[in-house]
A protein has these predicted regions:
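Histidine-centered catalytic micro-motifs
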Residues: 1-2, 452-459
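Intrinsically disordered, low-complexity segments enriched in small/polar residues
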Residues: 2-32, 143-159, 231, 240-247, ...
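Aromatic/His-enriched, Gly/Pro-containing loop or helix-boundary segments
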Residues: 9-55, 315, 442-443, 457-461, ...
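N-terminal pre-domain segments of enzymes
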Residues: 10-28, 364-391, 793-795, 800-802
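His/Asp/Glu-enriched, well-ordered alpha-helical/loop segment
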Residues: 21-26, 30-34, 42, 177, ...
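Polyanionic/metal-chelating signatures
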Residues: 49-202, 206-211, 338-344, 349, ...
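C-terminal cap of metal-dependent C-N hydrolases
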Residues: 322-364, 400, 742-786
Length: 805
């Protein structure tokens, strides 16, 4: 059902309805303190430049004559200033007072003491990205709103003015570049996408993890500022401690020195920085290590001279030796700039000489003819053992038991043909393989549709909950997909092909979900199930009223179960008012601030976004359904739904699906009446039922979760399997492509050693869109290869420790 935007009501900013930017914690003149404290684009480092002699000396001793002085805290941090590193008056040292705006994409961190008291928004990585997105939208809106007022001063109120948003006008107008500081290689991708979304001029501070996803770097058209802060080999006392060091940590240590060379190989322009170095004296030794790992000396020199000068808009003053340019020079002795024995003799800044002290750089204890173990790469190439194992034109399975989960039911001695990623035939037919067909003919195998998990929190970076506010409809799980998680491989090993990644249950209105296919090896965007309708997480019960959060959490509304429906009513009412204002603006009225929270709720009202609601108790379930019916909204799924069996008729009448736990009960007070027969009872009453994992571990054996519907309630085997295949596909509105083995659907299937509901059966192969992503024997070989790589890296790390003692 679709709601209209013409409902009468108070203005959009009526706080009684819970509307207005202040409610969201989005930075504004009257905004919530949390977001304001981390959004400070008006900060100017030119006003704060007051370096101590020790800092200046350390940089000059490494050969630097000028530097870009950057803000180091917050999300939108402020404007950097390019300064000379001479010892004169700091005000006279400023060469360019406004260089770049800086934005950090990193999950907020808190101490153990801070975790026991309320935190301000944003409290998660997805919240940080939402703050950046909303603030940039607000900056655009301020410019548009003031322009409209200047043309219509007599017909509307004067708009508010924010110095913070005014500071972002050069950014949104593409007059000032933005340096994004992502915390991981996947956030490099997100930074580039944000820059594209808002047509910004981006630079990227490299994370040191670019080796993980060179394919992502290949597609990013932005210069990189590259630290030479490499992790050191950990010194551990005995072999057992070494064995406990994770392979991924050793890989990161081994790959790090080659990061700059990799970026140049991928065609990215780089500038080098001392950022992250605990000791500036490590800069030149680390740079020589980067050169040994493939960075050319010419590229290294350019990355310290011409490139940063041009990126900072100072190519006419710095970066090369030429008449008319500033007299900034670095003099080396004992060889060229980056030779092993060369050293900085002196620097000249604005025509003044600064001699470098004579110092003995640490030399390796090993003999000169002993090669440095870090000069070569031992770790396996990134992503080499991920991605499709087979990509045939067609795949034909013969002599199998097909569990179609469609009208044909279970078929013995059947065949399945998949071509170009789509199912062509399923059943008993003459199966003659054509050219390029991969044939699977194994005795006793069973084939099911790929399993689907309707409630997962796996593969989410930087926090599952944005729990700082009662409504966080503006945050998006799609912004923080973790394509590098080993969980992908582990869940493929259980036959899982699709997962509904949900925000947590910390608030009555949570964040937007993301449905993915488990295409292990793909980048974050490659995981997304593109045709899946948009959705959002809601929640009821103990979690949202904070009764289980601790004594310090007593100020956020709602604090009672009866407050939850009131809150939902407030936010949906606010969304109606927002829709009316947007409609009025489209018909010539004043522009309306785009509000990402209310926009998402408006999509629910328009039938464009599905609700997946965490729910336990029957009274709350009924109250929630009645509130939604009042707004002409049909709930897509009630998640967990532990007391759903008590109100099964009402749920069926509403038309909501039930995505339930198979057999969870008595793990907290509000689930004391939960029973393992709930799924079967709701199924009998005509509710579309699925079983979900809510657990990265349980998601590895969803077939056995389905089997519990047979044990508890006597559901037929074929119907029970649908609880983890066709039914969740229908709940997610993706059943046109997934959930059953029928012609025209995606070639997503799992091959089992025996009956799929038998505890003794194992998944042999998992295919997605006609590509093989898991094969049991290949997985064994993968584990063996990783073990050998782990041992080799441990030995290399031990040698490196000895070489620097």
């Amino acid at each position: 059902a679709r709601a209209t935007a013409s409902d009468e009501g108070p203005p959009v900013d009526d706080l009684a309805a819970g509307a207005g930017s202040g409610f969201l914690g989005v930075a504004s003149a009257a905004g919530e303190a949390g977001a304001k404290s981390v959004v400070t684009p008006e900060r100017r480092m030119a006003r704060e430049f007051a370096p101590d002699k020790k800092t200046l000396d350390a940089l000059r001793h490494e050969g630097f004559t000028a530097a870009n002085f950057v803000p180091d805290s917050g999300v939108i941090r402020g404007v950097s200033a390019f300064v000379s590193l001479g010892s004169g008056d700091p005000d006279e040292a400023v060469i360019r007072p406004e260089t770049f705006q800086h934005m950090a994409i990193d999950a907020p961190r808190s101490s153990s003491s801070e975790s026991s008291r309320p935190r301000a928004y944003p409290g998660s990585l997805m919240g940080v990205i939402s703050v950046i997105r909303q603030t940039l939208l607000d900056a655009r809106f301020q410019a548009r709103d003031h322009a409209h007022f200047s043309q219509n001063p007599a017909s509307r109120p004067r708009p508010a003015f924010s110095t913070m948003l005014d500071a972002l006008q050069p950014v949104t107008a593409q007059k000032m570049p933005v340096v994004f500081e992502p915390a991981s290689v996947l956030m490099v991708d997100r930074a580039a996408r944000l820059a594209g979304e808002f047509e910004l001029r981006p630079l990227i501070l490299a994370t040191g993890q670019e080796w993980r996803r060179p394919d992502i770097m290949r597609g990013i058209d932005a210069p990189f500022i590259v630290p030479v802060d490499f992790p050191e080999a950990v010194k551990l006392p005995d072999d057992e401690d070494w064995q406990a060091m994770p392979l991924d940590q050793l890989r990161a240590w081994d790959h790090a020195p080659g990061n700059a060379a990799l970026l140049r190989k991928e065609g990215r322009e780089i500038a080098l920085t001392t950022h992250g170095l605990a000791r500036k004296t490590s800069f030149r030794p680390n740079l020589r290590l980067a050169i040994a790992r493939g960075l050319s000396q010419d590229d290294a020199l350019a990355a310290l001279t011409t490139v940063p000068a041009r990126l900072c808009g100072l190519a006419d003053q710095l970066g090369s030796i030429a008449p008319g340019k500033l007299a900034h020079l670095t003099v080396f002795e004992n060889g060229r700039a980056f030779d092993e024995d060369s050293r900085v003799r002196e620097v000249w800044i604005d025509g003044r000489q600064y001699p470098a002290p004579v110092r003995d750089e640490k030399k390796p204890a090993a003999k000169k003819d002993t090669p440095n173990p870090r000069h070569t790469l031992t770790a396996a190439p990134s992503n080499h053992d991920r991605g499709p194992l087979l990509e045939p034109k067609s795949v034909l399975i013969r002599n199998a038991t097909l569990w179609t989960c469609g009208p044909e039911g279970r078929i013995e001695n059947a065949s399945l043909l998949v071509t170009d990623g789509k199912i062509v035939k399923a059943g008993r037919f003459k199966a003659d393989p054509g050219p390029g067909t991969h044939v699977i003919d194994l005795p006793g195998i069973h084939v099911t549709p790929g399993l689907i998990d309707c409630h997962s929190h796996s593969m989410i970076m930087g926090g599952v909950n944005e729990g700082t506010l009662p409504s966080t409809a503006m945050v998006r799980v799609a912004d923080v997909l973790n394509s590098e998680s080993e969980t992908l491989h582990q869940q493929l090993a259980g036959g899982l092909t699709v997962a509904n990644l949900l925000h947590g249950s910390a608030n009555p209105i949570g964040g937007q979900n993301c449905v993915i296919k488990l295409r292990d090896g793909a980048p974050p965007e490659g995981l997304k199930f593109v045709d899946a309708p948009a959705g959002i997480k809601f929640a009821l019960g103990e979690n949202v009223k904070q009764s289980n959060w601790g004594d310090a959490f007593k100020s956020r509304f709602p604090q009672s179960r009866m407050g939850v429906p009131a809150f939902h009513t407030n936010r949906f009412t606010a969304a109606r008012h927002y829709m009316a204002a947007v409609e009025k603006a489209a018909n010539g009225g004043p522009p309306v601030r785009r509000d990402l929270e209310l926009e998402a709720i408006s999509e629910i009202l328009c039938g464009e976004r599905l609700i997946h609601c965490h729910s336990y108790r029957q009274d709350e379930i009924l109250a929630f359904l009645r509130v939604m019916e009042g707004f002409k909204v049909r709930v897509a799924t009630l998640q967990h739904i532990l007391e759903g069996y008590k109100v099964a008729n009402e749920i069926a009448r509403h038309g909501a699906g039930a995505s339930a736990f198979s057999d969870w009960w008595a793990y907290k007070f509000e689930v004391l009446d939960a029973i393992p027969h709930a799924g079967a009872i709701m199924h009998e009453r005509g509710i579309l039922v699925s079983f979900n994992s809510d657990s990265s571990d349980h998601a590895r054996r969803m077939n056995l979760e389905a089997a519990k519907a047979v044990k508890y309630g006597g559901v037929s085997e074929e119907e029970a399997l649908k609880f983890v295949t066709l039914n969740p596909a229908k709940q997610l509105r993706i059943d046109a492509r997934a959930g059953s083995l029928e012609p025209g659907k995606d070639g997503d299937f799992a091959i089992w050693s025996g009956h799929p509901l038998d505890t003794r059966s194992v998944c042999l192969q998992t295919w997605i869109e006609g590509r093989q992503y898991f094969e049991r024997e290949a997985a064994r070989q993968r584990a063996s290869a990783r073990h050998s790589e782990h041992l080799a890296l441990i030995e290399k790390a031990k040698k490196d420790r000895k070489s620097v003692v």
